[in-house]
Amino acid sequence: MIRIRLATSADEAQLLELVRAFPTPTPISADTYSRMFRSKRADPYACIAVAVRDESLVGYLSGHRHSAFYAAGDTAWVDEILVLDTERRSGVGRMLMAEFETWATEAGCTLTALATAGAADFYRALGYATKAGYFKKYLANGEPR
């Protein structure tokens, strides 16, 4: 059985392995991850939800909320979501998104948003609609190696 909950300090090491499985051009060091994990856990505007099966993490979602004039209130943004290949199509992603939406609703957010390259059908099935394109630019201290 899968349980979805907010991350605790006890999840730090196991979550690093999932974070490192996320497809990204910039690998994360253990020190950088640890600093970010602790900062996010202490930040009331950040959310890290984890999916647990038999005491093992099988997925996670990281997001945050911020105020946005266009939304006339707070917006919740999904930074990243990852589900292990062995758990795909089992509802884990849907459960993680539901947990994030609950967190956002309880925080008073007026909408939630995200960017995706390959999971558009998944988000449409959850009721999300395409609104805009996604652009990014690495800054001098964030260039991929």
Model-found features: residue ranges?
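Glycine-rich phosphate/pyrophosphate-binding loop shared by adenosine-nucleotide-utilizing enzymes
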Residues: I2, E55-Y60, A76
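A short beta-loop-alpha structural element at the N-terminal edge
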Residues: I2-L15
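Conserved GNAT-fold acetyl-CoA-binding loop/helix
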Residues: L16-R38
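A short helix-loop-beta-strand connector motif used in the catalytic cores of GNAT acetyltransferases and
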Residues: K40-V50, W77
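Conserved beta-strand in the GNAT
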Residues: V50, S56-R65, L82
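Conserved acetyl-CoA binding element of GNAT-fold acetyltransferases
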Residues: G73-D85
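Conserved acetyl-CoA-binding loop-helix of GNAT-fold acetyltransferases
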Residues: V83, R89-T102
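Conserved active-site alpha-helix within GNAT-family acetyltransferase domains
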Residues: R94, E106, T110-T112, T116-L139
